[in-house]
Amino acid sequence: GLLNDDRFYSFLNKITAFIWAYAVTNPGVNALRTPIFAEMINIVTGQPVRFSDYLFDTQKLQNAFDNYTFSNNRAITKAMLTWWAFQNSSQELLSLESVLEIEHIYARNRQEKEHSLSNPRNVESLGNKVLLEKRINIRASDYRFSDKVKYYTGFENNRKQKKEGTKIKELTDLAAKATDFTESDIVERNAKII
């Protein structure tokens, strides 16, 4: 085709990162118009996409992400979790019929009952959230990690019915390797995502 795959891939990476940075620092679609339009002109004229007139201060941007509340009703939360899931090269494409929700790996209900996280904000951080099929999230939502493992990996119930696990590779890998998901796991995973 007419597109150079490498340049297009580079453009997609840059524009995705730019949109997320803008969503955290300058919320609102209108704020994106000017910088995106300028870079579209660069694409049309064959110039590299750099967003050079709209660079972010690294430390200020990191602080903005650290202080941002990634609530489940914000579009950026699900977008970043989707992007993160597909950074795993082993992640298979999901059916378009799959209804995905946001799962708290360390259950909110557990935190409300036990108050065991030293920083209560960690329960709502990206490091504690993952995409999960709705059919599984309903059953797994309030359990300890060790109890959630069977829902993540699949199991046979008392009536000998096979209950399929998640197709989210990161969760199946985590369920296979870990016996618990702790605050340090939340913090470490959050740093990787952001």
Language-model features: locations:
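A cross-family structural signal marking well-folded subdomains
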Residues: G1-K78, D173
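Short, flexible loop/turn elements at secondary-structure junctions
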Residues: I19, Y106-R110, V130-N137
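Long, cytosolic, alpha-helical-rich C-terminal regions that act as interaction/scaffolding modules
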Residues: V123-S125, K129-I194
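Histidine-centered nuclease catalytic patch
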Residues: L93-S125
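Conserved structured core elements
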Residues: D5-N13, R74-A75, L96-V99, P120-G127, ...
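Short cysteine-rich loop/turn motifs with clustered Cys
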Residues: A75-E101
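Extended hydrophobic-aromatic, low-complexity segments
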Residues: D5-F8, V24, G28, E92-S95, ...
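Residue-level signal for secondary-structure boundary elements
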Residues: W20-P27, P48, N73, S89-L93, ...
